[in-house]
Amino acid sequence: MTNIRKIHPLMKIMNNSFIDLPTPSNISSWWNFGSLLGACLALQIVTGLFLAMHYTADTMTAFSSVTHICRDVNYGWMIRYLHANGASMFFLCLFIHVGRGLYYGSFTLSETWNIGITLLLTVMATAFMGYVLPWGQMSFWGATVITNLLSAIPYIGPNLVEWIWGGFSVDKATLTRFFAFHFILPFIITALVMIHLLFLHETGSNNPLGISSNPDKIPFHPYYTTKDLLGAILLILPLMNLVLFFPDLLGDPDNYTPANPLNTPPHIKPEWYFLFAYAILRSIPNKLGGVLALISSILILAIIPLLQTAKQQSMMFRPLSQCLFWVLAADLCTLTWIGGQPVENPFISIGQTASILYFSLILIIMPTVSMIENKMLKW
């Protein structure tokens, strides 16, 4: 008798995606981050749902409702900090996942890559709106500064900003709509994840060698389910360490002060995972130029398949490209550090240099070095 998981219409989908899925036998731990992102998304949806049961999206009560969650709700403090620090883990996994795609040439799977970029943008939008909800000082001023960037769009900019605000400043209408969007977007993200996996399973996974995996594949279960479970445990350990011992390590002290439109904090900055883009935005003195650079810093990922000049898909056997990849990683760390510093020298000039290096590496230096490597290999 045929196993029910292979014939039942619903179970067949699960079976072909997570049990009998033919998987390359040599994919390394860098491939674990896809499943970890799924775990992070599930955690965010569950904790977010419980927070939404107690949160009120009103300027008068939002801050006190978050305080109420932390003080009066059973394990409310834990749910809140799991949600806040879970977002940090989510972005850490996202950046590593994208980095792995760049290093091993997974961007050649164009549909999967493009849906991935859409996912990255959607997750960033969701996280930004979530940061506004506690209605602390940094929530309010972060929302004001970031939404104000749209006013740089010629002709329609100012009207667009007021339309997003629902008035002439960030106020009750803004908070209500941000909560509505923050609630619905994770479910849209879940749908996009399914499309991401659909396209991935059409072509099959890439592997560290960058060659065809067809001659040597193994079933996903039990090999990679066990491996993913180990990855999840190793992710939970630092997350729980953060939540239970250092819950405010990655937050901003200003967000423990209720939002006050009459008092601007000395340094307005977003959460750590947006600091690299924020540093690029600040490194250009012109408002429109800064906004374009900010958008380009993410959307540049979409043109990476067009910039591929290497004859080998993976960087596994390309030491020069490997060095440049890690220079790019170090550059992004530098930008993250600069984004959290005040706007004064030497931070301004370091930020400008790091921003120029970021775009130069992706657009010019890495494609050129790939061509040199082709010549060295006589290809």
From Swiss-Prot:
<feature type="transmembrane region" description="Helical">
    <location>
        <begin position="320"/>
        <end position="340"/>
    </location>
</feature>
<dbReference type="InterPro" id="IPR036150">
    <property type="entry name" value="Cyt_b/b6_C_sf"/>
</dbReference>
<comment type="function">
    <text>Component of the ubiquinol-cytochrome c reductase complex (complex III or cytochrome b-c1 complex) that is part of the mitochondrial respiratory chain. The b-c1 complex mediates electron transfer from ubiquinol to cytochrome c. Contributes to the generation of a proton gradient across the mitochondrial membrane that is then used for ATP synthesis.</text>
</comment>
<dbReference type="GO" id="GO:0006122">
    <property type="term" value="P:mitochondrial electron transport, ubiquinol to cytochrome c"/>
</dbReference>
<dbReference type="Pfam" id="PF00032">
    <property type="entry name" value="Cytochrom_B_C"/>
</dbReference>
<feature type="binding site" description="axial binding residue">
    <location>
        <position position="83"/>
    </location>
    <ligand>
        <name>heme b b562</name>
    </ligand>
</feature>
<feature type="transmembrane region" description="Helical">
    <location>
        <begin position="113"/>
        <end position="133"/>
    </location>
</feature>
<keyword id="KW-1133">Transmembrane helix</keyword>
<keyword id="KW-0479">Metal-binding</keyword>
<dbReference type="GO" id="GO:0046872">
    <property type="term" value="F:metal ion binding"/>
</dbReference>
<keyword id="KW-0249">Electron transport</keyword>
<keyword id="KW-0812">Transmembrane</keyword>
<dbReference type="InterPro" id="IPR005797">
    <property type="entry name" value="Cyt_b/b6_N"/>
</dbReference>
<keyword id="KW-0349">Heme</keyword>
<feature type="transmembrane region" description="Helical">
    <location>
        <begin position="178"/>
        <end position="198"/>
    </location>
</feature>
<dbReference type="InterPro" id="IPR048259">
    <property type="entry name" value="Cytochrome_b_N_euk/bac"/>
</dbReference>
<dbReference type="GO" id="GO:0045275">
    <property type="term" value="C:respiratory chain complex III"/>
</dbReference>
<dbReference type="GO" id="GO:0008121">
    <property type="term" value="F:ubiquinol-cytochrome-c reductase activity"/>
</dbReference>
<dbReference type="InterPro" id="IPR030689">
    <property type="entry name" value="Cytochrome_b"/>
</dbReference>
<feature type="binding site">
    <location>
        <position position="201"/>
    </location>
    <ligand>
        <name>a ubiquinone</name>
    </ligand>
</feature>
<dbReference type="InterPro" id="IPR005798">
    <property type="entry name" value="Cyt_b/b6_C"/>
</dbReference>
<feature type="transmembrane region" description="Helical">
    <location>
        <begin position="77"/>
        <end position="98"/>
    </location>
</feature>
<dbReference type="InterPro" id="IPR048260">
    <property type="entry name" value="Cytochrome_b_C_euk/bac"/>
</dbReference>
<dbReference type="InterPro" id="IPR016174">
    <property type="entry name" value="Di-haem_cyt_TM"/>
</dbReference>
<dbReference type="InterPro" id="IPR027387">
    <property type="entry name" value="Cytb/b6-like_sf"/>
</dbReference>
<keyword id="KW-0999">Mitochondrion inner membrane</keyword>
<keyword id="KW-0496">Mitochondrion</keyword>
<feature type="transmembrane region" description="Helical">
    <location>
        <begin position="347"/>
        <end position="367"/>
    </location>
</feature>
<feature type="binding site" description="axial binding residue">
    <location>
        <position position="196"/>
    </location>
    <ligand>
        <name>heme b b566</name>
    </ligand>
</feature>
<dbReference type="GO" id="GO:0005743">
    <property type="term" value="C:mitochondrial inner membrane"/>
</dbReference>
<keyword id="KW-0830">Ubiquinone</keyword>
<protein>
    <recommendedName>
        <fullName>Cytochrome b</fullName>
    </recommendedName>
</protein>
<feature type="transmembrane region" description="Helical">
    <location>
        <begin position="288"/>
        <end position="308"/>
    </location>
</feature>
<keyword id="KW-0408">Iron</keyword>
<keyword id="KW-0472">Membrane</keyword>
<feature type="transmembrane region" description="Helical">
    <location>
        <begin position="33"/>
        <end position="53"/>
    </location>
</feature>
<keyword id="KW-0679">Respiratory chain</keyword>
<keyword id="KW-0813">Transport</keyword>
<feature type="binding site" description="axial binding residue">
    <location>
        <position position="97"/>
    </location>
    <ligand>
        <name>heme b b566</name>
    </ligand>
</feature>
<feature type="binding site" description="axial binding residue">
    <location>
        <position position="182"/>
    </location>
    <ligand>
        <name>heme b b562</name>
    </ligand>
</feature>
<dbReference type="Pfam" id="PF00033">
    <property type="entry name" value="Cytochrome_B"/>
</dbReference>
<comment type="similarity">
    <text>Belongs to the cytochrome b family.</text>
</comment>
